[in-house]
Amino acid sequence: MTDQQLNTAHLTTPAGRPRARALGVPFGGTPGRWNAITDVPGVEVGYRTIIRGETARTGVTGIHPRSRDGALDPLAAGYAAQNGNGEMTGAAWVEESGTTSLPIALTNTHAVGIAHAGIVAWAARHYPELGDNWSLPVAAETWDGYLNDINAHHVTEEDCVAALDAAGSGPLDEGAVGGGTGMICYGFKGGSGTASRLVSHDGTSYTVGVFVQANFGARRELVLAGRPLGDVLPEDDPLSEYRAAPPGAGSVIAIVLTDAPLLPHQCTALARRVTLGLARTGTAGSHSSGDLFLACSTANPGGFSRYGQRGPRPYDQLTFLPWDAIDPFFTAVVQSTEEAVANALCAGEEMTGYRGHRIPGLPRDRVAALFRARAEGARRRLD
């Protein structure tokens, strides 16, 4: 892969939408090949985007943490919540067992049950050996009812299956795609966003990837790379006049995946660091927001026995990082989360939907000019 291809993947999505780095927004750390959660080996992501007429602005995002072929192999997992006005199915089992298996789906609030059923349907088709065994997959949601007729139940089980079947590796589209189609972030069009960081330990390079469904924050709160923007971009904020929800309401789901070998409690520690990355974008965490996070390690394949199918071995065995080596992975989560939110915003474009509700896209030219002026000012101070 050439340097030009690498730079293109960091600057634009496959659909040609700009990413935050294309606007001159600076970030710390070293991103992976695609600067996406798919930089973690084996991770596959797919979208089912539903835009029909004036009422449907929604969809499903499907994530295979260990590829389709590893869907039944439990991963070390940890769950954390910043604010609990939301739903992530399977979270109680993650907390109890320290593991999860099967794909993950992200969608809208009133379709979370459909997405859960869709994951089970997908697994039953591809893994008939599951038989009558129980499944507790992870399906999570954010509310898209401003742009989408959320009570019309546009999302079906087949949409979820289609998202999982469409999943692949490589660079990812961002913004109004998949479960992020109708989502709003800081009063601008938000949605799906992703980023990654490389972390070296004991001579091995590991990857931490984050995927967010960004649907949170009031306009006045917005910060990018330490630059407050809410005060300079206050105009054209139709959501501020929407009385059905208080400012800052919405929700954000974050999925953190890494190929570093971790214990379940270490995964929980990574999930908690998502909060710090979100805070860098300005939010204080609204009481009306559902901010739920899942972190998993794709290392140690076969390390956990499937529940009820232990087989001949009397013990499970895992390799894991010592706790005193984990801080760089915390930093990677924080940096990737911040950039994933910024990427969701930068890919967003104006959308009109249900009841004529309209949300503007981030004014990218103005944001780019602000960061260009900041960079030029910094250079002058050094001269």
Placement of each model-derived feature along the sequence:
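Alpha/propeptide regions of enzymes that mature by internal proteolysis
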Residues: 2-383
